[in-house]
C-alpha cells in the first residue's frame, strides 16, 4: 500500500512526522518480536498457523459442498465474527454462488423475521461463528435458524450446520452432541483480527473468492512490515501520523472512499480501531464516509465544521470497468462530459475533494492497485499491524475490549441471566 498526505494546516509537517517516527521506531522492532504483547492476541501474526495449506484445503472443500447443496449460506455472527467476511463478500462475490445471508448481528424482531422469510423455498446451510458462544445476538439467531433447518430437513438438518468456536467451548460441545461440523475459532486471536482464519475465509470461499490469493496479499503486507526500515514502513508511518495528529488535538479520523464496494470494509476498520484504542479515556474516534454520495451530507461539516477530524482516503487506482459517456442527442447541459469515462468523473471528484479538504484539515491517502482478493488480505494485515503500533503509541492494549462488558451486565440482568 502507498501512503501519502496533503496538509495546509501546519499540523502534519515533514519535520514533525520525522520526529514522531524516530521516537516510536523502537516500537516496530518490539512488535516484530511480539515483546510486551499479550500472546493470546498475536496469533494472526503467524499467518500459516490459521491459514496454512491444511486449513485452506479443508475450507475449500467445505465451501465446495455448500455451493453444491445450498442456494443460501447464512453466516451467524456479530462484530469481529462477520465484519471481515462481509467486507470481502460484498465487494467481490462471484456470480452463480449461493446468496450470503447475514444473521446474528441484530436483536430487531422485524429484521430477523425478514431474514428468516428470505430463506423460504431455498436450500440453505448455516455457520454459527462465536468465540465463546455467550454473545446474545448470534446465540438467539442460531436457535431460530436451527428450528428453521429442522422444520425443513428433519433429523438430517445437522449436515447443514457448521459452527466456528474455540476448542473446549460450549459451542464445540454442542457440535459434538448434535453432529454439526466444527471449525476452530483461533484461541490466540481476538474476533476483530480473525480475517485470515476460518472465521473470515469460509464465507469468502463459499462466495467464490480465491482465499489463497487473500492469504498471498496478507503475506505481502506482513513482509513489508517486517522488512522495511522505519522511514519507509507504511504501517509505522500511518500509525505515526495518527499519533501526531492526536497529539495536535484531532479526535476523529474519517476513513473515506469513492468506491462503494469498500463501505463494508470501512465497518471492519471502524471496529478494529474503536475496540483496540478506545480505552482509558484515549483514542481517536473512527468514523467512515462513502463518497461521492456523502459529500452531499457530511461534506459541509468536513469543509467548514468543528476542526476535530482528519481524513484518510482509501483509494483504488484501477477499476477495470470502462463506462464511456457518449452523446445521446439530448441537450442536457452535460455536454462537457462527452467522450469521458465514468471512472474519470470519480477520479476528478476524488482529486478535487482531497485538494479542497486539505486546506482545512490533514488528509492522508492510502492507495491499493485494484479491488481484488490480494488487496483485502493486504488491507486487513496492514491495518492490523498499524493498529498495534498506534495502540502502543497510546500505551493501551490493542487486544482487549473491557468496556463492552458494562452494557452486557445490565442486559443479562434484565433477561434473567446471572451476569458475572
Task: Show where each model-derived region lies.
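Glycine-rich phosphate-binding loops that contact phosphosugars or nucleotide phosphates
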Residues: 64-228, 409
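Active-site phosphate/pyrophosphate-binding segments
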Residues: 152-311, 400-420
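Helicase-primase coupling helices
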Residues: 287-371
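C-terminal helical/tail subdomains of lipid-metabolizing enzymes
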Residues: 370-420
Amino acid at each position: 500500500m502507498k501512503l501519502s498526505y496533503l496538509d495546509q494546516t501546519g499540523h502534519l509537517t515533514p519535520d514533525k512526522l520525522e520526529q514522531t517516527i524516530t521516537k516510536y521506531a523502537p516500537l516496530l522492532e518490539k512488535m516484530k518480536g511480539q515483546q510486551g504483547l499479550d500472546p493470546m492476541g498475536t496469533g494472526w501474526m503467524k499467518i500459516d498457523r490459521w491459514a496454512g495449506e491444511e486449513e485452506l484445503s479443508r475450507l475449500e472443500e467445505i465451501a465446495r459442498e455448500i455451493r453444491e447443496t445450498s442456494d443460501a449460506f447464512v453466516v451467524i455472527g456479530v462484530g469481529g465474527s462477520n465484519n471481515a467476511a462481509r467486507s470481502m463478500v460484498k465487494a467481490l462475490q462471484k456470480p452463480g454462488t449461493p446468496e450470503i445471508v447475514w444473521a446474528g448481528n441484530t436483536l430487531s424482531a422485524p429484521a430477523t423475521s425478514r431474514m428468516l422469510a428470505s430463506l423460504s423455498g431455498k436450500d440453505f446451510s448455516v455457520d454459527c461463528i462465536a468465540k465463546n458462544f455467550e454473545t446474545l445476538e448470534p446465540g438467539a439467531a442460531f436457535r431460530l435458524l436451527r428450528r428453521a433447518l429442522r422444520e425443513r430437513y428433519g433429523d438430517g438438518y445437522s449436515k447443514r450446520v457448521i459452527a466456528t468456536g474455540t476448542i473446549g467451548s460450549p459451542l464445540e460441545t454442542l457440535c459434538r452432541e448434535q453432529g454439526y461440523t466444527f471449525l476452530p475459532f483461533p484461541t490466540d486471536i481476538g474476533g476483530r483480527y480473525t480475517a485470515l482464519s476460518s472465521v473470515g475465509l469460509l464465507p469468502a470461499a463459499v462466495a467464490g473468492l480465491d482465499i489463497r490469493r487473500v492469504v498471498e496479499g496478507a503475506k505481502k503486507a506482513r513482509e513489508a512490515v517486517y522488512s522495511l526500515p522505519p522511514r519507509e514502513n507504511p504501517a509505522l508511518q500511518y500509525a505515526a501520523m495518527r499519533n501526531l495528529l492526536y497529539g495536535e488535538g484531532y479526535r476523529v479520523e474519517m476513513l473515506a472512499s469513492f468506491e462503494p464496494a469498500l463501505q463494508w470494509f470501512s465497518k471492519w476498520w471502524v471496529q478494529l480501531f474503536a475496540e483496540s484504542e478506545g480505552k482509558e479515556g484515549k483514542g481517536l474516534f473512527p468514523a467512515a464516509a462513502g463518497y461521492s454520495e456523502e459529500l452531499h451530507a457530511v461534506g459541509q461539516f468536513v469543509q467548514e465544521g468543528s476542526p476535530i477530524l482528519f481524513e484518510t482516503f482509501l483509494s483504488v487506482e484501477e477499476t477495470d470497468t470502462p463506462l464511456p459517456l457518449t452523446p445521446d442527442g439530448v441537450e442536457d447541459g452535460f455536454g462537457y462530459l462527452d467522450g469521458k469515462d465514468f471512472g474519470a468523473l470519480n477520479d476528478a471528484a476524488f482529486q478535487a475533494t482531497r485538494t479542497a479538504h486539505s486546506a482545512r484539515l490533514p488528509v492522508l491517502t492510502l492507495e491499493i492497485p485494484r479491488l481484488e482478493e490480494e488487496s483485502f488480505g493486504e488491507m486487513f494485515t496492514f491495518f492490523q499491524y498499524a493498529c498495534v503500533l498506534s495502540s502502543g503509541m497510546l500505551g493501551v492494549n490493542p487486544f482487549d475490549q473491557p468496556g463492552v462488558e458494562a452494557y452486557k451486565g445490565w442486559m443479562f440482568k434484565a433477561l434473567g441471566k446471572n451476569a458475572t
